[in-house]
Amino acid sequence: MNQSNSTFKNMSNVNEALIKPFPNSNKIYVQGSRKDIQVPMREITLTDTIGELAEKNAPIHVYDTSGVYTDSNVNIDLRKGLGNIRVSWIKERNDTEILTEFSSNFSNERRDDVQLNALRFEHLQVPRRAKDTKNVSQMHYAKQGVITPEMEYIAIRENCKWQEYKDQIGQKKGESFDANIPDLITSEFICSEVAKGRAVIPANINHPEVEPMIIGRNFMVKINGNIGNSVLGSSIEEEVSKMIWGIRWGADTIMDLSTGKNIHETREWIIRNSPVPIGTVPIYQALEKVNGIVENLNWEIFRDTLIEQAEQGVDYFTIHAGVRLKHVPLTIDRVTGIVSRGGSIMAKWCLAHHTESFIYTHFEDICEIMKQYDVTFSLGDGLRPGCIADANDVAQFGELETLGGLVKIAWKHDVQTFIEGPGHVPMQMIKENMDKQLEECGEAPFYTLGPLTTDIAPGYDHITSAIGAAQIGWYGCAMLCYVTPKEHLGLPNKDDVKQGVIAYKIAAHAADLAKGHPGAQIRDNALSKARFEFRWEDQFNLGLDPDTARKYHDETMPKQAAKTSHFCSMCGPKFCSMKITQEIKTMNVDEIAKINSIQIEMDKKSAEFLKNNSEIYMKKNT
């Protein structure tokens, strides 16, 4: 990864495609109880209905993950990073301190290496840590009944002004499978859910740029997007661009899964420019530190890596602590064995040393680190099935049972925790996964990779997995990890990232509708109304991907006049069902009365026919 200072100077000029506002959309901010709680939303302006059904159409407000990148009033300079919106909240709590240097030996070595000057983020911040080993987690505050600014921010964000449309929704009743979804999300409800462990707020004290969000089954289903370099390619600039691209289209969190060179510097650039929580798999970097030799991994190296990443601002760690020595033989008869990178690393280490992993034996030590920075556990499913033939087997569920025990330990330390899940699971076996996770893990939030519902579609696994994602999201899964078309095939590019995010936004929204989440149907109703009224621009702009919708329409009807026509190229002007229905709706009273009178006469004739034993021909009276 040979990048020069000149390369990063160019990063101040962000690609226009990454930051241009969505069409007919404005970034608005809803203020909370204090001036520094400014909650972003995207307001989509709609055109008026014209003709005999004329009326004004109110703007629609949608949840927005794109940060300031789509705010036309903000100048973006990636070299400087984002504004620290949470810094005053963190300071006010008076339970953290600014360190004089990094606590990680590796971080200090990287800082002092002049050869890295060309790669380094220019404005390194000095890290914070809890004072006197205090606990600074959102769960710790919640258990004390403290409603933090982060919780208030999230309450405003989750409601997304939906009550303004309450009388217009006509929302279909959902099936939430015993979830506890209120009509209105309040700060108190969020505090209660976090205290019970049913929701998490990933918000490291060293990531003050993050816009607070929540993951839990009683909230909107969230999605994660994966990025990261590999030994075969990519650059820091490319990975930062992928992050911005992913959140533009709706990724609620981003995982940096880098396994190539300069992982530390890549992560710093991503975090400093990310308004969404960032997750990592620390064992990847720890393995790089021992030159890829699994047997040489140890607790000291892993501990230093955790501290290094916590002080950079990583919001959640995937930790494969549930892979036990006794589980490894259970995978022998599988078709695809162990497919998790982290899981295979820990399994190999356990076999090499013939003992439990240092992650499992030092789990409480890890908890002590997590609560000093408010890093959230994402307890990894290292033994997830890699094909539908291996779904729901004894190895997978054995690990899940171990994770259930680890959740209780994490909660004892007031460390926020969610659980990772499969994988490849056929549709008829998906609900068992959700039910067992709720039972074993005390309703801690579930986070799944899909699951993929069939193995026959390489190149289309964003579709095979979105099917399972929608299903498990309906059953109660709190966050869905996207899958791109490149899954199993290669490192995704920007276009793959977009396709994966859009597929999973569809799955998450479908799950919200099925659960009956309050306000979930507002956008659907607005788009359906625009479609019926041939307001083409509104149709495009209300969609998850206005660019693609407009492109498909214009391929056959490119002229501007086509944007006001009352038909599309599918049916043409004579066979459009909605045009015909509109004509029916706009008939005048006399026409409708005439039709009704004809119908009355027809009904009379029908009754007469039935009275005469339904005879087609009747004898003539002589």
From Swiss-Prot:
Catalyzed reactions: 5-amino-1-(5-phospho-beta-D-ribosyl)imidazole + S-adenosyl-L-methionine = 4-amino-2-methyl-5-(phosphooxymethyl)pyrimidine + CO + 5'-deoxyadenosine + formate + L-methionine + 3 H(+)
Residue numbers binding Zn(2+): 424, 488
Metabolic or biological pathway: Cofactor biosynthesis; thiamine diphosphate biosynthesis
Pfam family, one: ThiC_Rad_SAM
Record keywords, A-Z: 4Fe-4S, Iron, Iron-sulfur, Lyase, Metal-binding, S-adenosyl-L-methionine, Thiamine biosynthesis, Zinc
Cofactor: [4Fe-4S] cluster
GO molecular function, one term: zinc ion binding
Binding site for substrate: 226, 255, 284, 320, 340-342, 381-384, 420, 447
Keyword Metal-binding found: yes
InterPro entries listed in its UniProt record: ThiC (IPR037509), ThiC-associated_dom (IPR025747), ThiC/Bza_core_dom (IPR038521), ThiC/BzaA/B (IPR002817)
Biological process, per Gene Ontology: thiamine biosynthetic process; thiamine diphosphate biosynthetic process
Record: residues binding [4Fe-4S] cluster: 568, 571, 576
CC annotations in GO: cytosol
Keyword Metal-binding belongs to the record: yes
Binding note for cofactor: Binds 1 [4Fe-4S] cluster per subunit. The cluster is coordinated with 3 cysteines and an exchangeable S-adenosyl-L-methionine.
EC number, as in UniProt: 4.1.99.17
Family (UniProt): Belongs to the ThiC family.
Functional summary from the UniProt entry: Catalyzes the synthesis of the hydroxymethylpyrimidine phosphate (HMP-P) moiety of thiamine from aminoimidazole ribotide (AIR) in a radical S-adenosyl-L-methionine (SAM)-dependent reaction.
Entries under HAMAP family matching the protein: ThiC
Description of how the protein assembles with itself and partners: Homodimer.
Listed name of the protein: Phosphomethylpyrimidine synthase
